[in-house]
Amino acid sequence: MQSAPASAQGIPVAYNDTVVRQFAIMTIIWGIVGMAVGVFIAAELIWPTLNFDLPWLSYGRLRPLHTNAVIFAFGGCALFASSYYIVQRTCHVRLISDKLAAFTFWGWQLVILLAAITLPLGITQGKEYAELEWPIDLLIAVIWVVYAFVFFGTLAIRKVRHIYVANWFFAAYIITIAVLHIMNNLAIPVSLTKSYVIYSGVVDAMVEWWYGHNAVGFFLTAAFLGMMYYFVPKQAGRPIYSYRLSVVHFWALISIYMWAGPHHLHYTTLPDWAQSLGMVFSVILLAPSWGGMINGIMTLSGAWYKLRTDPILKFLIVSLSFYGMSTFEGPMMSIKTVNALSHNTDWTIGHVHSGALGW
């Protein structure tokens, strides 16, 4: 379906909703697949013989498939769909190129299929959330550059002067993920299916968790905040509670989040000052995170009655509640004394799942 509302000048605009719908459908499909794999490997922890002594069904190979499917297939398709949907409606223009938008869709599905083939076969870099080997990494980089061109190109031809705050969050996520992906995956290929990362030892660990933490921070947080800042006011039929707070939320989040990665490496050979730095910035993150949560929830001021009848608003408010809970739990678990108790326990797994599924 091609939407045709009026632009700022009153001229009808035919939005490209085809690619949005395609990504939305694949979001559902990959969500089912990713969570089904998660249920299967959880069952393997109880009944190990479920792997039937087949290496490609072993927990060690399917766990990366589960995380990649949920984060990059399920979450990624949701973000492509929502960013394309929102940027058109807040800029009052059609996507700058339908063909390039279609390329990002088919290219991203190819990446997902290649991941689904290579990970169970054990073709991996062995880096969490960055397991895919160098040919797939290159393909991701190409797709991401095209995605950035489509998004920023659409912003450049907008019919309204103002850039809505949701687009700031999407822009930050697109730029940051590009930097993280390229820097963390710098490697020397030795064959089509094998490469060696250029970093070693504790430097490799630091770069990996700079990437790993901020993949969560920008892919699963900043980008979904962009979604929140559009759909919560839209569904509530009210302006965002405090637009000024949303701008402060944006700049505080992107300034602080990048420094918090070392909290994944407490009590390791990472220098103690780096661990402490990560802890401090993680604790500071509580302020902008809760500011954003409060901003979203307070947008319903004067419209709380809609929660009784609007199922979409119910989901949005519950997701904001989970966001608040997870962003309290994360800074708390980054404190070294707390981390000494929580590290390598199911609490960490619960924290990740409450954030990913709840938010």
Task: Tell where the protein language model's regions lie, with residue ranges.
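Cytoplasmic juxtamembrane interface segments
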Residues: 4-16, 148-163, 294
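Segments that form or flank anion-binding pockets
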Residues: 128-132
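Alpha-helical transmembrane segments
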Residues: 297-308, 343-344
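Helix-boundary and loop/linker segments of multi-pass membrane transporters
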Residues: 16, 61-63, 305-308, 347
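Hydrophobic cores of alpha-helical transmembrane segments in multi-pass integral membrane proteins
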Residues: 21-123, 134-155, 167-192, 208-235, ...
